[in-house]
Amino acid sequence: MAKFQDKLISDGYCDNRGAGFCATATSLPRGEYGFVALCVKGSNLNLYDVDMKSNVGELLYEVDLKQISNLKIKSGFFSQILKFENNGSVYSFTNFVGVKPALKVIEEEANNK
């Protein structure tokens, strides 16, 4: 995971806090789902399409973390869930592990209103 985060930083997808990781999108505003990269840059959470070889593709969404509501981060035995709302749309992600520092950055930015 660290190599991928280093690549996200060096390629400019996320800032030097390294809050970037891949997850499975289970709910996005236009109905997309699948493998995405979540990258925090400043106070924005940018969502990028990612292929199965971890190649980052097009920018799908740019979300101002200061504008999100109903942030939920749940940790279970087998998986974690990240879910929030923005402008009336629900964003939901699962199938990510070992990203507690990145989730902490998301939570801090969301609470920094």
Feature map (PLM): residue ranges:
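Anionic N-terminal interaction surfaces
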Residues: 1-42
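Short non-domain terminal segments
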Residues: 2, 19, 82, 91-94
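Canonical phosphoinositide-binding patch of PH/PH-like domains
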Residues: 88-105
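Phosphoinositide-binding peripheral membrane targeting modules
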Residues: 28-37, 41-87
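N-terminal functional modules and adjacent low-complexity/disordered segments of proteins
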Residues: 3, 72-73, 88, 98
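Short acidic DE-rich linear segments
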Residues: 108-113
